[in-house]
């Protein structure tokens, strides 16, 4: 479930009337504004829509229980109190006091299909960075110039788009769900869990190379990974869990001693928070968004991006130093419990009030 969907759910629980709209023609406005650009002219609505539905793995009242089970939603992801719309235009059946775009594509819809002053753009990371969008980064740059009030989730974005006078809130995790199992097993084991997600910005190739170094150099290492990275690209010595359910991810965290995030660029990634809440020690590449809550040598080990060897070295160091492991684990769990669903919703509401 994506961060925007988690926010919608929590706001609904606080008795706000919330709706999620999936555009059935997501690039319609961009194609009209930039008719000469072939790389958006050829993009149809269905791939974008299907990708959003599959990647977010959440359920709402229009999905039958069997599909809900297949999508791996097995804890409190009930969206019965959130309205869901599939529409070509925002104006079709949706009348709201405020409209929030959650990426560069929907930003064009909010800017051109709502009244002035009602539109916001929640940007989780710099979508104009080529490592994220490649040859579409120019379109994201255009989105940041739209007359929308900008809301961001990390300090780097505050500085990068300072001229837009953005406001800040932090995302969070379901703290009652993510919790440790047996810390004794973690302290005596060599189980490493790696996030392997699709897209250049997620750094899966560096995670896999770090896993190879761990496998070759750390005795009795047990390496697991999860994500949506292509299965045929993951070596057989890695126990790979492709698109696991929420319950399965929790069990992976609980069994792991060290969690590795190899990403190049993130907004404010939740997996390290989930892992720390579940008792893991985190090793992360310095992918921007982790700076919100990770502090090197205090609650994690942070290493340069695009460097498999330093990821491996950090894991090895933690496994060899039990005192360091315990310090990072204890501080990590304390940190994670500050970033909760409830705090996320409260910070968001405060940020929105600031922009009225």
For every predicted segment, state its role:
Residues 86-95, 127-152:
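Membrane-proximal helix-turn-helix segments that form the acceptor-binding/catalytic region
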Residues 341-356:
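C-terminal alpha-helical cap of glycosyltransferases
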Residues 251-256:
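Short alpha-helical donor nucleotide-sugar binding micro-motif in glycosyltransferases
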Residues 296-297, 301-308, 317-322, 337:
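Conserved acidic donor-binding segment of nucleotide-sugar-dependent glycosyltransferases
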Residues 151, 183-202, 208-213:
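Conserved donor-binding/catalytic core segment of Leloir-type glycosyltransferases
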Residues 281-284:
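Short hydrophobic beta-strand element within catalytic cores of glycosyltransferases
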Residues 130-134, 165-189:
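Acidic anion/phosphate-binding donor-loop and adjacent secondary structure
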Residues 264:
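Aromatic "clamp/platform" in nucleotide-sugar-dependent glycosyltransferases that forms part
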């Amino acid at each position: 479930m994506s961060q925007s969907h988690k926010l919608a759910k929590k706001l609904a629980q606080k008795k706000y009337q919330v709706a999620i709209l999936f555009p059935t023609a997501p690039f319609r406005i961009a194609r009209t504004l930039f008719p000469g650009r072939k790389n958006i002219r050829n993009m149809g609505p269905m791939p974008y829509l299907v990708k959003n539905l599959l990647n977010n793995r959440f359920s709402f009242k229009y999905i039958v229980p069997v599909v809900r089970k297949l999508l791996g939603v097995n804890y409190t992801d009930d969206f019965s109190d959130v309205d869901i719309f599939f529409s070509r235009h925002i104006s079709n059946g949706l009348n709201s006091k405020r409209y929030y775009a959650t990426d560069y594509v929907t930003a064009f819809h909010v800017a051109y299909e709502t009244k002035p002053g009602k539109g916001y753009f929640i940007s989780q990371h710099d979508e104009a960075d080529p490592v994220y969008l490649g040859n579409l980064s120019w379109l994201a740059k255009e989105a940041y110039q739209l007359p929308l009030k900008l809301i961001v989730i990390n300090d780097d974005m505050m500085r990068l788009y300072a001229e837009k006078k953005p406001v800040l809130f932090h995302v969070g995790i379901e703290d009652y769900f993510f919790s440790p199992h047996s810390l004794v097993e973690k302290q005596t084991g060599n189980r490493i869990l790696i996030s392997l997600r699709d897209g250049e910005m997620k750094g899966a190739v560096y995670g896999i190379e770090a896993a190879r170094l761990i496998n070759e150099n750390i005795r009795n290492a047990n390496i697991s990974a999860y994500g949506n990275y292509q299965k045929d690209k993951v070596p057989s010595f890695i126990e790979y869990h492709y698109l696991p359910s929420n319950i399965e991810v929790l069990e992976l965290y609980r069994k792991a001693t060290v969690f590795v995030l190899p990403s190049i660029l993130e907004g404010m990634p939740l997996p390290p928070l989930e892992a720390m809440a579940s008792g893991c020690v985190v090793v992360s590449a310095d992918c921007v968004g982790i700076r919100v809550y990770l502090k090197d040598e205090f609650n994690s080990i942070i290493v340069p991006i695009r460097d498999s060897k330093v990821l491996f070295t950090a894991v090895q160091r933690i496994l060899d130093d039990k005192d360091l492991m315990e310090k990072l684990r204890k501080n990590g769990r304390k940190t994670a419990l500050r970033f909760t669903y409830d705090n996320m919703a409260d910070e968001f509401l405060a940020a929105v009030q600031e922009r009225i």
